[in-house]
UniProtKB/Swiss-Prot annotation:
It comes from Klebsiella sp. GO terms for molecular function: trans-permethrin hydrolase activity. Catalyzes the hydrolysis of pyrethroids pesticides. Hydrolyzes cis-permethrin at approximately equal rate to trans-permethrin. Its EC number is 3.1.1.88. Keywords: Hydrolase, Serine esterase. This is Pyrethroid hydrolase. The keyword Signal does not apply.
């Protein structure tokens, strides 16, 4: 065999010849053509995906816009549930039975002491923990009085008896109360031992609950005559206008982005056929692709070859493809495919979490996160950990896939959040998420969402002794059997906003908003991303804070504020123009105009956050789109 490299038959000594184009220069050119075709294919796919995402977002926002009416349909079942709950709140037999049960549990660890009977009236809290302004009387027929005629009386329950007492309540009490302490003009009474306690029907708190019940019942009767359709109040219409402004702002943003990506798609899509044709022709010439750069004089001196090399280099720089093996790995994964549906759902959920963190909440992932994902899918790496940063809101997140907890359990995802507060302190909090690819029938067999949550939170102790928040991702529509909130998402998802399950302790003792189940179903159009965004937004805004028994000078959060609607850190305090309340805080997002209200429960002082009807993760009142229920004591706010 004779090989001629000059490219002309006249240089051959033999009569027969067969031309070959499979030379290093052409092998490299074919590699460039094939790689460019792959890149263009991926870019076209990305453009199509973004077009679809922006179209879906526009469709979803238009649906929300169309749903804004000057009336709302009231959920009758939730009104009935509220009436049943309110009835128990002024039923002194029920209340006193609960008090007796609580007292027995407290006294197990205390030495029994001689007790005397008396009457105690609690008024508003003093501001100190477990203390109230008070009055007393020795017998039922006496008048209420101060302990000393010219002074004030304070009652301090101390920590162990705190759960028995409530502001604006009158009690008949048998207790051992030692000599009082003095604090200026005030006398401080505190029980050393309580042997019996019962609330009196004439208590202002009981009367108020009875009035609330009567008002709600009368409203319910009136609504039943109007097919449960209620006109919005002036305040509700004002809130709706704010939401409409936010939606229109987001519509404008997504319409602009959709137009931009449409231009990119229109420019790239026609490039596919020419590259496919060139690749086909080169392969017909029996040229084999090779990525090795041919450092030959032919390649260096030929401007056509040089143009191919420099053009490919510029293309990679333009799209940020520093490592070509990522592109090759993606092609291999595409060829392999995934047929294990639970595993596919699990990894799909992982990608949705990443998508919400990066696209909705604007976190920046570490540089090599794609390589880590690819290594996991290819089976080269089981556990992966990806860092996400958002310095604008002083938060960092470590997302782990299939990690081991300290107790040896292995959930699907763990998100460790580190936040720096406005005063420079650090907050550390963990969210554990497990993806369950269950059918509706199988979910029911497992005890519904309550059974699955209980198994993970308590049984497997994903909560690590109630230190972590634990949520389940599932694809089942209408998974919530006993809906407790009137929001649209409450049929499919449960965010721990109110007590729901038999295994939960009394509402004031449970870990509110620390566990739940969220519907992540791709068949829900773009709404499934909102479900995940609402869950993660709740954790990043509310879950990392200590919200219980909040008595701060302001209802604001310690961590840096951000917008749960668009993820922007450009939120401004507009409290002075919205409210004269010294504790309450109003924030408006400068990018999407979304309003966030920081307030607290008047009954138990739990901090509460309202994010408008659509994004609020706490339960709204059945007959109001602006008033919510406290997740801790379940009182209306």
């Amino acid at each position: 065999m004779e090989i001629c490299t000059k490219g002309s038959r006249k240089h051959l000594t033999s009569r027969a010849s067969e031309p070959s184009y499979n030379v290093p220069e052409n092998q490299y050119v074919l590699y460039v053509v094939s790689s460019t075709l792959s890149i263009v294919k991926q870019l076209v796919k990305v453009a199509e995906s973004k077009k679809s995402r922006f179209s879906g977002a526009i469709e979803k926002l238009n649906e929300r816009l169309d749903s804004l009416k000057d009336y709302r349909i009231i959920n009758r079942d939730l009104v009935v549930k509220d009436l049943e709950r309110l009835k128990k709140r002024f039923d002194t037999e029920v209340i006193n039975a609960e008090l007796s049960e609580q007292l027995a549990k407290i006294n197990v660890n205390l030495s029994r002491s001689y007790s005397e009977k008396g009457y105690l009236r609690l008024e508003k809290a003093t501001g100190s923990e477990n203390e109230w302004w008070a009055k007393i009387k020795p017998s039922q027929n006496d008048d209420w009085q101060q302990f000393e005629p010219d002074g004030y009386t304070i009652f301090s329950s101390r920590d162990h008896y705190a759960s028995l007492f409530k502001s604006y309540s009158d009690y008949e009490i048998e207790a051992k109360i030692p000599l009082p302490l003095r604090r200026g003009k005030a006398v401080v009474l505190y029980p050393e031992y309580i042997s019996r306690i019962c609330v009196l029907p004439e208590s202002r708190s009981i009367q108020r609950e009875q009035e609330n019940f009567t008002k709600l019942r009368d409203k319910g009767i009136a609504l039943s005559k109007k097919d449960w359709q209620a006109k919005l109040t002036t305040d509700e219409l004002a809130e709706q206008e704010k939401e409409r402004a936010t939606i229109n702002k987001r519509l404008g943003y997504f319409a602009t982005e959709h137009e931009k990506v449409g231009i990119v798609h229109k420019a790239l899509e026609p490039k596919l056929k020419p590259f496919q044709q060139i690749e086909k022709e080169w392969r017909q010439c029996k040229v084999k692709s090779k990525s090795t750069f041919p450092n030959s004089m032919t390649f260096v001196q030929n401007p056509a070859y040089q143009a191919v090399h420099s053009g490919f280099k510029k293309l990679k720089e333009q799209i940020g493809l520093a490592d070509e093996d990522i592109l090759l790995s993606l092609e291999k994964i595409e060829a392999i495919g995934l047929v294990n549906m639970p595993l596919l759902y699990e990894r799909w959920c992982l990608l949705q979490i990443i998508k919400v963190l990066t696209q909705a909440f604007r976190y920046q992932p570490e540089d090599n996160w794609k390589r880590k994902l690819i290594a996991n899918i290819q089976g080269n790496e089981e556990q992966i950990s990806i860092q996400f940063f958002n310095p604008s809101v002083s938060r960092a997140i470590t997302l782990q896939y299939e990690p081991f907890l300290a107790n040896g359990k292995r959930p699907d995802f763990v998100l460790d959040v580190e936040a720096i507060t406005k005063s420079g302190n650090q907050i550390s909090k963990r969210l554990v998420v497990d993806a369950k690819y269950y059918s509706a029938a199988y979910l029911k067999q497992r005890g519904g969402i309550g059974g699955v949550i209980h198994e993970l939170y308590n049984g497997k102790d994903y909560s690590e002794c109630q230190e972590n928040s634990v949520f389940v991702l599932h694809p089942v529509l209408d998974a919530v059997e006993k809906v407790v909130s009137p929001q649209e998402w409450a049929k499919d998802s449960y965010l721990g906003e109110l007590s729901m399950f038999d295994w939960e302790p009394a509402h004031h003792q449970r870990q509110a908003t620390n566990y739940g189940a969220v519907c992540a179903n791709p068949m829900k159009s773009q709404r499934y991303l909102d479900e995940i965004q609402r869950m993660l937004g709740m954790f990043l805004q509310y879950g990392i804070e200590d919200n219980t028994s909040f008595r701060g000078a302001s209802d604001d959060t310690h961590a840096v504020n951000f917008c749960v609607s668009c993820g922007s850190e450009k939120v401004v305090d507009v409290t002075k123009s919205m409210s004269s309340n010294n504790q309450k805080r109003w924030y408006r997002c400068n990018e999407c105009t979304h309003f966030t209200v920081y307030t607290h429960c008047g009954t138990c002082n739990t901090r509460l956050i309202k994010n408008g009807e659509y994004w609020t993760y706490l339960s709204l009142m059945p007959m109001s789109s602006i008033n919510i229920k406290c997740p801790n004591c379940e009182s209306p706010v």
